[in-house]
Amino acid sequence: MQWIKIFTSIFGNPKIQLLLKERDGDTIFRIWIQLLTIAGTSMQGGKIMVSTNKPLTVEDLAKITQKTNKKIKNILDKLIHCEMILFENNTYIIKNWEKYQSADKYEKMLEQNRERQRRYRENQKNENNVDVTLR
């Protein structure tokens, strides 16, 4: 996925308001946005992955953000407490990813684009294989 949805009312969200009032609230918010973009890149239903089979770890996120492991762990715990992310099977997951990101619509759009491209190529092939007869 090359984009993620962020609603214009994000700063009116009580969870975001509470997080922004925390010490280092700006950092927490930035990391939240980074988690959304990483989940969007991995395209695994909101799972926050480094690669197809490797979930993002506290250590990975600390390296990416240049923060300490302790700070990242505290931030992730706050996001879990606010029910913004889940931690299941050693994987951080954006809660309600499908609902907010319309991933199903994105997949449908990709499928429509593939079908449109297939038809275009078929038409190009048919046009290039036309027999010309001379009189």
Name these PLM-found stretches.
Residues 1-93, 101-107:
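Positively charged, structured surface patches that bind polyanionic biopolymers
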Residues 105-135:
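Charged low-complexity intrinsically disordered patches
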